[in-house]
A protein has these predicted regions:
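Short gly/ser/thr-rich secondary-structure transition/capping motifs
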Residues: 41-47, 104-107, 128, 256
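Residues at secondary-structure transition points
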Residues: 26, 30, 48, 52, ...
Length: 332
């Protein structure tokens, strides 16, 4: 059974069948449905190698997992965004290639090599860091890519994100509105844009309420429970506070553990607010108040943007800001 047999029975040219196999956006839905039905009836299922030869593509997209999540598969953000990416990639017949790294330099080179060697047709970056060197190189080379996050540089790129600064500001304003005046902040790795943005939201909320930032109440943490635990231990040595804003749920859960070990009643004596509203927050005691970020949707939209860029459809640049909201539970 060959592609010509499918074309003859479907009443189209072999090149049209090839484009249907590639899920080309310029082929009408009716034609795609008719060709796919004939393929199913004939038992014609082109493998990935055959599709690659037809399309001059790899039928794969890369997911670049930076050191933000390196060694941290326990963070629910990562599987949630991958699930969103996978759900749309599957519909396009695309495989995922996951790239990890031990350094920023290795991360950049691995990503570029994936594209240069045509092992992937485009990449999704799960984070950007300060003074990012990879994004300018990707943009200059014309490689298809999408960033989940915010980019500080001048290059015009495709991105999808939530308003981390504005969302953090709302979360801290919520605490200030409940009467807290000594609000501590557990920020993430300062090399990452997401950490800087959420810390900026903390600063803005304090300023709008006429409060100055006390450096003793700001600690940086790894994006992990242990990181939040250790950062809170340092906070407890630095001064008094009645609330903690943590830029990630795992950091917040670590903070709660450190407070509870000291006999502090979380939610009554000290309020704790997290960020991302991952599934773990609903199961700690008390349940965690957190900023809900549509993580799954971030992954879905990133693939939609990337496939549009690869296939030359849609608009460029495509930039979307998703809405987040505060989910109030027992911790604050």
């Amino acid at each position: 059974m060959t592609i010509k047999d499918v074309a003859r029975l479907a009443g189209v040219s072999p090149s049209t069948v090839s484009r249907v196999i590639a899920d080309h956006p310029r082929i009408s839905p009716n034609t795609k449905e008719r060709v796919r039905q004939i393929m199913a009836e004939l038992g014609y299922y082109p493998n990935a190698i055959a599709r690659s030869l037809v399309n001059q593509t790899s039928n794969s997209i890369g997911v670049i997992r930076s050191r933000l999540t390196q060694g941290n598969f326990a963070n629910p953000f990562f599987p949630a965004v991958i699930q969103g990416i996978s759900s749309v990639a599957y519909k396009h017949g695309l495989s995922l290639v996951l790239s990890t790294s031990n350094s920023f330099t290795h991360e950049d080179e691995e990503c570029l090599n994936l594209l240069r060697q045509r092992r992937v047709d485009g990449v999704i970056l799960l984070a950007s860091h300060r003074q990012d060197q990879l994004i300018p190189r990707l943009a200059e080379a014309g490689f298809p890519f999408v960033l989940i996050g915010r980019y500080e540089g001048s290059e015009v790129i495709n991105w999808v994100n939530n308003d981390n600064t504005g969302d953090a500001k709302k979360a801290v304003s919520y605490l200030l509105g409940k009467g807290h005046r000594r609000v501590a902040c557990l920020d993430g790795d300062p090399r990452y844009v997401v950490s800087a943005d959420r810390l900026a939201g903390y600063h803005q909320a304090l300023a709008e309420h006429g409060l100055e930032v006390d450096p003793a109440l700001v600690e940086h943490s790894e994006f992990s429970v242990d990181g939040g635990y250790r950062a809170t231990q340092r906070l407890l040595q630095n001064g008094e506070f009645s609330a903690i804003f943590a830029v990630d749920d795992l950091i917040a859960i670590g903070a709660m553990r450190a407070l509870q070990e000291r006999g502090v009643v979380v939610g009554e004596e000290v309020a704790v607010v997290g960020f991302n509203n991952t599934i773990l927050g609903a199961y700690v005691q008390p349940a965690l108040t957190s900023v809900h970020v549509p993580i799954y949707e971030l992954g879905q939209i990133a693939v939609q943007m990337l496939t549009a860029q690869i296939y030359g459809s849609g608009t460029f640049p495509d930039q979307q800001m998703l809405q987040a909201q505060l989910v109030v539970r027992g911790s604050a």
